[in-house]
Each structure stands twice: as structure tokens, then as C-alpha cells.
Curated annotation (Swiss-Prot), chains A, B:
It holds the Pfam family PRA-CH. It comes from Verminephrobacter eiseniae (strain EF01-2). It is an enzyme of class 3 (hydrolase). This is Phosphoribosyl-AMP cyclohydrolase. The gene is hisI. Pathway: Amino-acid biosynthesis; L-histidine biosynthesis; L-histidine from 5-phospho-alpha-D-ribose 1-diphosphate: step 3/9. It catalyses: 1-(5-phospho-beta-D-ribosyl)-5'-AMP + H2O = 1-(5-phospho-beta-D-ribosyl)-5-[(5-phospho-beta-D-ribosylamino)methylideneamino]imidazole-4-carboxamide. Belongs to the PRA-CH family. Gene3D superfamilies: Phosphoribosyl-AMP cyclohydrolase.
Amino acid sequence: MDWLDDVKWDAQGLVPVIAQEQGTGDVLMLAWMNREALRQTAALGRAVYFSRSRGKLWFKGEDSGHAQTVHEIRLDCDRDVLLLRVTQQGHQPGIACHTGRHSCFFSRLGDGAWQAVDAVLKDPRAIYG
Amino acid sequence: MDWLDDVKWDAQGLVPVIAQEQGTGDVLMLAWMNREALRQTAALGRAVYFSRSRGKLWFKGEDSGHAQTVHEIRLDCDRDVLLLRVTQQGHQPGIACHTGRHSCFFSRLGDGAWQAVDAVLKDPRAIYG
């Protein structure tokens, strides 16, 4: 498919992908996709990433139940970064982070240190237990 | 400085950085930082990236005038991605993209093709001329 060839995959065949929450505009996480992950994301309308640590496709929510419905897929001007507009499923408000928080970006720089400033919405042991 | 050591720099000494607009929540761009870029960003309160193509620090706005004032710096749960909350300077509405558009993510997937769906706000020749 031509549109998959338009993406500039890196040396590992990956691109970074930003997941932004529909409605709030909150940036939830950054993950990675390979060609097959992007193809499946577009086909299924749900986020499928490539797990670099596990070396395989990661159907977001397969363990946690916190899947992401994908409303829109965008590509940047250099064609090497993707932006998804998503609805985070399985909890209200949405939990994108494996720590049980809304967003993975819960640490803020202040007074020369990273400080966790966002609440844990659900105990990770209850998510993955 | 300890907080710089907390970041998990990749094999090239870099991390991806998402710039999100304060107020609108729009995702403007993704760029990269090395340790020195992050140190200067925090010290100056303006976005300083590392240009992978030029192999040196990139003081965002040095050519275009479209600098980014940084309100907040966040780190993700894996400590290998940064999120900036910024105000895009030099034009109203802000122009983050070298194509003269608000955001670098102006191409949307639809009908099996990437389609440019956001307007050019200023001719790039007028920005960089």
C-alpha cells in the first residue's frame, strides 16, 4: 500500500507515535510502530504498536483492557513521526500508562528534580493482576 | 546535575521531545534533544533541540523567529521521552512547522492516502528568506 511506503521508517523499521486523547487533547504516551503495526492500526481502528522490549506487535490493551480507539492518524512534515487521536478505553478517565495514571507524562521538572505530579487512578496490580 | 542523569538517553545520546502548545493543547512537532539541549532548554526557558541532520544544537527560532517559550518540561514513565508545554512565538496563530503551518502534523490519512489538511499560514520563503 502506497501510503505505508510514504512513511520514512528508521534503520530499525520504526517510527515514534504520539497518542493524543480526543476531546481533552492530552498527550497520553509515545510508543513505536513498524509497518505492520501501522497497517493493522488503520485496518482495525485501534492502536497497535511495536514493542521494542518484546520485539513484537503490541495490541494496546491486550493485557490491561486499556485499548485505544483511533479516530485519526497524522504524519508529520518529515514523514517520520505519527500522531494518533484516540479514545482511551476501559476506565473513566482513561488510563494510558502502565503505572495506572492517565498519561505517561506524569513527572514534571521542578526545583531541579522530576516530581510525580499526577495521581494513580488504579492500582497496577489490579490492572495486570 | 542529577535530573539530567535521570533521563534515559538512547545510543546516540538523544531522546524524542514532543512540543505541545499551551492553551490549545495542539501537538506542534516532535524533535530531539541531547543532554546539553535539555540543560539549555531548562536554563533559558526556551526550546533548544538537537538537530540530527545538522549534528548540532538547534535554538528553535534562530532562523525563523518562531521560538518556543517553555512553560513546563515533563518526562514519561520510561524516562526516555520528554513533553514540553510551549508558547509558539513570532506569529499569531503560532507557526511551528518549516512549511509555514501551525503544526508539523498537517497530513491526515484518509481514503488510503496522506492528505494535507491544514493551511499554510505564512509562505516559507517569507519566513526564511
